[in-house]
Amino acid sequence: MELKNKKWTDEEFFKQREEVLKQWPTGKEVDLQEAVDYLKKVPTEKNFADKLVRAKEAGITLAQPRAGVALLDEHINLLRYLQDEGGADLLPSTIDAYTRQNRYEECEIGIKESEKAGRSLLNGFPGVNHGVKGCRKVLESVNLPLQARHGTPDSRLLAEIIHAGGWTSNEGGGISYNIPYAKSVPIDKCLKDWQYCDRLVGFYEEQGVHINREPFGPLTGTLVPPSMSNAVGITEALLAAEQGVKNITVGYGECGNMLQDIAALRCLEEQTNEYLKAYGYNDVFVTTVFHQWMGGFPQDESKAFGVIVTATTIASLAGATKVIVKTPHEAIGIPTKEANASGIKATKMALNMLEGQRMPMSKELETEMAIIKAETKCILDKMFELGKGDLAVGTVKAFETGVMDIPFGPSKYNAGKMMPVRDNLGCVRYLEFGNVPFTEELKNYNRERLAERAKFEGREVSFQMVIDDIFAVGKGRLIGRPENK
């Protein structure tokens, strides 16, 4: 099937669906009409899309952790703990690494080995292997909406199972769950596989079942300039809307400068709505998610809480609908349930104290928003041009030409010629533009900001700054300064 940004026909969708459900025996558990009936009985307080709509209308920010273990009962106990003790507003099920690579036989071994060991030997919840019945048991054991969070380039079977299991949100997209996660997955294949996931959600919407879709905003989580991550989020929102998705949460990963982060999140929401309306998608409800710091964390727990609360402050002042919570064990590895709950509690405390407060518009905020919007528009305009009006085709060509270029992405289809670095205030700017199609005016703005840092630090603008910035937060500060600064 040729890639194009056009809603799949029922015939195209159901033909491919026959093959998808054969990928693992639990695919047989999915009966679409029965799933529609089941989902219609899910109470609204456990529907992810509905809860996001209510939160946005109320002007509050919801807190959602990451969490997932191999065994069903242990996973349920973990989620209940984060719900009851942590006070989470929304629940995740972080999916294990084997499922992300469609290696279900190894998942099965991991489940059996976990049972023998009496603890999880997988780094997440193997949703496909637990099947529709297992996913429903999880949903029926908690009081909050559930979302699958993963990193799967081919999420088709996983999407079928989790949605039939009553989970009303799926994270990911054809760019954001490929370029940062995989080395050798062709971009056109991944885009088609995610068109399937979106078409599935579109089918449910046609039956009156509301399901949320969330592009993964932080990408590689390492110094991603806001305009690049925003361009990805807007692209994935447009591709999802074409397949019939009506409830979309666009995401952004904290860069660290409060003003830039607030500007970026507001630009993301505004431009997503602008582009959706410009292309005729007038009935899509857009919300935002802010990811707490995705880079290296300090090992000291008290310092880690400082990072968590700073991020929460930014999310709240930006007006995010949701914040993804980190834990004080981030630098060490997979957190205990207690550490995970403590991250949620710290986040919720900050959200409660800041409820209703927003960063007011200022000259500086206005300038930053104008820059981000202009840069984002340059990227998106070129993508539409490359695809001759077709954004899916334009996405493939944008990666081929380096117009879209994700810093530090492992994919061999990513140019890797663009290089980011912080300016003197900690904003993430473009050090090397590669083939990112900015105007000379925008390029000069980036260069001027970096020259200010070079002057302050008494050194040349160079790749050493990038290295210093990558490790800075783990060492206790935002900007990677030389020792004498």
Swiss-Prot record:
GO molecular function terms attached to this record: cobalamin binding; methylaspartate mutase activity
Pathway this chain belongs to: Amino-acid degradation; L-glutamate degradation via mesaconate pathway; acetate and pyruvate from L-glutamate: step 1/4
SUPFAM superfamilies the record matches: Cobalamin (vitamin B12)-dependent enzymes
Keyword Transferase: no
Positions that bind L-glutamate: R66, R100, R149, H150, E171, Y177, Y181
Reactions that this protein is recorded to catalyse: (2S,3S)-3-methyl-L-aspartate = L-glutamate
Cofactor(s) listed: adenosylcob(III)alamin
Binding, adenosylcob(III)alamin: G68, N123, P180, F297, K326, E330, I334
Record keywords, A-Z: Cobalamin, Cobalt, Isomerase
Any one of the GO BP annotations: anaerobic glutamate catabolic process
EC number: 5.4.99.1
Gene3D superfamilies assigned to the protein according to its UniProt record, in alphabetical order: 3.90.970.10, Methylmalonyl-CoA mutase
Domain of life: Bacteria
Statement: the UniProt record of this protein carries the keyword Isomerase: yes
Family designation: Belongs to the methylaspartate mutase GlmE subunit family.
Quaternary state and interactors: Heterotetramer composed of 2 epsilon subunits (GlmE) and 2 sigma subunits (GlmS). GlmE exists as a homodimer and GlmS as a monomer.
Role, per record: Catalyzes the carbon skeleton rearrangement of L-glutamate to L-threo-3-methylaspartate ((2S,3S)-3-methylaspartate).
Protein's UniProt name: Glutamate mutase epsilon subunit
Organism whose genome encodes this protein: Clostridium tetanomorphum
